[in-house]
Design a protein with these regions (language model features):
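Hydrophobic packing segments in regular secondary structure
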Residues: 1-54
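Extracytoplasmic/secreted envelope proteins and their assembly/folding machinery
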Residues: 8, 53, 57, 61, ...
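Acidic/histidine-rich, surface-exposed loop or edge segments in extracytoplasmic proteins
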Residues: 37-40, 63-70
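Solvent-exposed, acidic/flexible segments
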Residues: 46-53, 77-82, 115, 130
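Catalytic cysteine-centered active-site loop
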Residues: 66-118
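Aromatic- and glycine-rich peptidoglycan recognition patches
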Residues: 110-113, 128-174
Length: 174
């Protein structure tokens, strides 16, 4: 049926959420401030039925395995956490420009974890010495995010490291 073809098309476009298996890229891993390797994660198919999130995820997953670059904001330069999120959302018709994690927090509607859905943002404080929000990721649902650690990778926001820095969730508007 048409719905099944749409899901198959999304699967093809996103390479099943595992692009490193298909393009010779690195698997999620390495270390960021958490010291933890990346997690092999596949976004549930039902989350991808939301076309807005599917488009955000399609763009975001292209860069899983890309090394972290402080101040980076394009695929050519590499990404830091806010550069990655800004790139993904700007490519999907959001007008967020290039800002910091704290800047994204200020641009977003603050929501609870219970209200958070795939495609919202998840924010952290104290991941390095800066006032306000110091890290941002794209929430994937089920306690998972994708963010620019080193490299860009999937992570569980309730792991011991991320849990102690969890500061809140935000939703951007077009």
């Amino acid at each position: 049926d048409n719905d099944q073809w749409k899901r198959y098309e999304i699967f093809q476009d996103t390479l099943g959420g595992r692009p490193y298996l298909f393009n010779g890229g690195l698997p999620p891993g390495g270390s960021d401030g958490s010291g933890a390797p990346g997690i092999d994660y596949q976004v549930p198919a039902e989350a991808l039925t939301n076309s807005e999130f599917a488009a955000i995820y399609k763009e975001a997953q292209k860069y899983v395995g890309t090394p972290y670059v402080w101040g980076g904001s394009t695929p050519e330069t590499g990404f830091d956490c806010s550069g990655y999120v800004c790139w993904v959302y700007n490519q999907n018709g959001y007008n967020v420009g290039r800002t910091t994690a704290n800047g994204l927090w200020n641009k977003s509607q603050h929501i609870s974890e219970a209200e958070a859905k795939p495609g919202d943002l998840v924010f952290f404080e104290g991941t390095y010495d800066t006032p306000g929000k110091s890290h941002v990721g794209i929430y994937l649902g089920n306690g998972m995010m994708v963010s620019a650690g080193d490299p860009i990778k999937y992570a569980n926001i309730h792991s011991s490291y991320w849990e102690k820095h969890l500061a809140g969730f935000g939703r951007l508007s077009k």
